[in-house]
């Protein structure tokens, strides 16, 4: 793993310190990306595969420990080095327990930094299996059912090619995880993975997001912006919910795919792009074509290779390992010593229909961990939709007044359910910071 091939992400809210580290690391032959807070770091880690993350421990909004845990949750294989002042060595020890590979004392000794980086990267090489870790293991795709094995086999076959991939499946089945695995296992893995949910934007905003815009192209366009195609140049562009785009956007997207070039909104300049396209939808695009709602020529361009996502109800044997996987994740995050599920609770999970698929299972397990006061998750902690019968409230005395902390937790959990588990959006809707939301959940 030579310096020219190594990508390092530096995370520090001290911009001057970031700049110094960037210049230093580049001088040693590394490629360097910067993030000025934890949220930026998570965005970058989701978009690109880094060989190492160098993260400060003291940052506003999301500190280094929380950033470390989120990175490790997303991809446990990324080595993370923590930077800390003398006064916070105890916190650095906590970081090691949370998965950090090592820590460095600030102000940094540059010789020590160079040695630690070399050792960390060497450790990473040695820890890699001769057989490359499966995309499933890297991105949390858990299960050994026939349907899951077939899915993983498809990923292994398709990933090395540059073919356009259409992922079809119900909401919550893990289409984005498959896109990430395809990118990470491809020759483009060192280049960006850019993700865009087409259903989240109206036509004009989607056009600007995809192709970029010139300054003054429309009201509010105060500077030129590159689109997602240009951002993904050399890498992979994942377009989720492609079946929801308008007829006009279908025409523009078709041209971009056919010609491998785009134009910013408000510009006549043509930009060549080298992008592997992965698209996903919950719709049956063949039916959409028959109904005249989706262009046949675009459908053929997208449908080069199809990967069908099995719904969770079609692979019930994967529910126990998935539930245990999420249990471990959220028990660690909430610092709870949870031993597992009662047989009755697991039986309910296995036999529930899961209309929201894996996402619904994850949310149910997270909710159960947050509400749990004992060692085993029982039907009491599971949502009413799963148990099928109301679970009696825990006694609070004759006046039946819930403690405020429980009321707050219920409000937070309700907000999380409505935002699909998005903690940042849930915090915004509740009028609190993300850090406050996480603190209240962990009580």
From Swiss-Prot:
One of its GO terms (molecular function) is ATP hydrolysis activity. Residues 423-442 bind DNA. GO terms for biological process: phosphorelay signal transduction system; regulation of DNA-templated transcription. Activity of the ZraS/ZraR two-component system is repressed by the zinc-bound form of ZraP, which probably interacts with the periplasmic region of ZraS. InterPro entries: AAA+_ATPase (IPR003593), CheY-like_superfamily (IPR011006), Homeodomain-like_sf (IPR009057), HTH_Fis (IPR002197), P-loop_NTPase (IPR027417), Sig_transdc_resp-reg_receiver (IPR001789), Sigma_54_int (IPR002078), Sigma_54_int_dom_ATP-bd_1 (IPR025662). Residues 7-121 form the Response regulatory domain. It is found in: Cytoplasm. NCBIfam families: PRK10365.1. Part of the Zra signaling pathway, an envelope stress response (ESR) system composed of the periplasmic accessory protein ZraP, the histidine kinase ZraS and the transcriptional regulator ZraR. The ZraPSR system contributes to antibiotic resistance and is important for membrane integrity in the presence of membrane-targeting biocides. ZraR is a member of the two-component regulatory system ZraS/ZraR. When activated by ZraS, acts in conjunction with sigma-54 to regulate the expression of zraP in the presence of high Zn(2+) or Pb(2+) concentrations. This is Transcriptional regulatory protein ZraR. It comes from Klebsiella oxytoca. The gene is zraR.
